[in-house]
From Swiss-Prot:
It is found in: Cytoplasm. GTP binds at residues 166-173, 191-195, 213-216, 283-286, 314-316. Its cofactor is Mg(2+). An essential GTPase which binds GTP, GDP and possibly (p)ppGpp with moderate affinity, with high nucleotide exchange rates and a fairly low GTP hydrolysis rate. Plays a role in control of the cell cycle, stress response, ribosome biogenesis and in those bacteria that undergo differentiation, in morphogenesis control. This is GTPase Obg. The gene is obg. The lineage of its organism: Bacteria, Pseudomonadati, Pseudomonadota, Gammaproteobacteria, Alteromonadales. It holds the Pfam family GTP1_OBG.
Length: 386
């Protein structure tokens, strides 16, 4: 199935049902009074995470989703039924933004988690709501309010513990093939990897972690060069990054300069992502003599002013991969188990959150009734005993 990690959709919450004007008319019950019922609220629109989905490709074909409208009120104080909510299934790891304002509505990181993205309209009020001692036969009602309409941007962020980044042909896909059962495409030309790949690394006795491989970065990726930097967002939820460096690049470039390019692109894309824990992994040590490899590694560390973890591996022969994976597992076990989204949900205000507080107040001054007029305020009634 085609991997799609971004989609735009439009959601339309249901309109609220209108209130009803009605009066009780039964034999032997004169002046029965108002009995018009309220309308029903419009249905809301929700996103729900589904662990059985792994792509947003379905949203390329269906882009509009709407909830049901609330039913109108009826006489005999009958309230209209509420509109049915619309629930849209999305993959676990989906982030939802308002496409017009850019605000983050929320992240769906657990199976079954729901997020309201559009609130249904508030129900209209029937004339029974407006009866009072001075307004015994009200002929006013309110209509239901329209449901919210939002343009949404859905972004799928892979849920992985470890993320790999580096230049094309650094050996990231080969590393994943050697430590997990994943089989991403491997070849001797740049950009063999076109979409992110996931692999599960098992160290036995229930100790495992998920590793993500994204397409390689090149200089200017943040400005759109190569495949761009948009795949970097899949690393935002990773807890540690493995910066893979090719000790003997096929194009003859300097490994130290290549490492600086990756760090520069990382900082341009997201300073928060650049501040994540990062380990250096020098790959293809089998292509150089040990002394030559050490010289290159020291030159890279000096250029980066690096004092963090350093690992030497040969992914194709699995040399050094077990040590690296074991250290990764131990590092992850020491971290807190709770997951904190990188970008917290912003405070989202829905259109009709406070409508019910003001709906009646706005109509309190309405004088359209049968029993009262402004002239009545100036009328003086004198009672005399005959």
């Amino acid at each position: 199935m085609k991997f799609v990690d971004e989609a735009k959709i439009k959601v339309d919450a249901g309109d609220g049902g209108n209130g009803c004007i009605g009066f009780r008319t039964e034999k032997y019950i004169p002046r029965g009074g108002p009995n018009g019922g309220d309308g029903g609220d419009g249905g809301d629109v929700y996103l729900q995470a589904d662990e059985n989905l792994n792509t947003l490709v379905d949203f390329r074909f269906v882009r509009f989703y709407d909830a049901e409208r609330g039913e109108n009120g009826q006489t005999r104080d009958c309230t209209g039924s509420r509109g049915k909510d619309k629930i849209i299934q999305v993959p676990v790891g989906t982030r939802c933004r308002d496409a017009d304002t850019g605000e983050v509505l929320g992240d769906l990181t657990r199976d079954g988690q729901q997020l309201m993205v559009a609130k249904g309209g508030f129900h209209g009020l029937g004339n029974a709501r407006f009866k009072s001692s001075t307004n015994r036969a009200p002929r006013q009602k309110t209509d239901g309010t329209p449901g919210e309409v939002r343009n949404l941007l859905l972004e799928l962020l892979l849920l992985a513990d470890v993320g790999m980044l580096g230049l094309p042909n650094a050996g990231k896909s080969t590393f994943i093939r050697s430590v997990s059962a994943a089989k991403p495409k491997v070849a001797d030309y740049p950009f063999t990897t076109l979409v992110p790949n996931l692999g599960v690394v098992s160290m036995g006795y229930g100790r495992s972690f998920v590793i993500a491989d994204i397409p390689g970065l090149i200089e200017g990726a943040s400005d759109g060069a190569g495949l761009g930097a948009r795949f970097l967002r899949h690393l935002e939820r990773c807890r540690v990054l493995l910066h893979t460096i090719d000790l003997l690049p096929a194009d003859g470039s300097d490994p130290a300069e290549n490492a600086l390019v990756i760090i520069a692109e990382l900082k341009k894309h997201s300073p928060k992502l650049a501040s994540k824990p990062r380990w250096l992994v020098f790959n293809k040590t089998d292509l150089l003599l040990e002394d030559e490899a050490e010289l290159v590694i020291e030159r890279v560390k000096e250029a980066l002013e690096w004092d963090g973890p350093v690992y030497k591996v040969a992914a194709i022969s699995k040399t050094g991969t077990d040590t690296l994976c074991r250290d990764v597992v131990e590092y992850l076990e020491e971290l807190p188990a709770e997951f904190t989204p990188e970008e917290e949900r912003q405070q989202v205000e829905f259109q009709w959150d406070d409508y019910h507080k003001t709906a009646i107040e706005e109509l309190d001054d309405d004088s359209d009734d049968d029993d009262w007029s402004e002239d009545d305020e100036m009328m003086e009634v004198i009672y005399t005993k005959e």
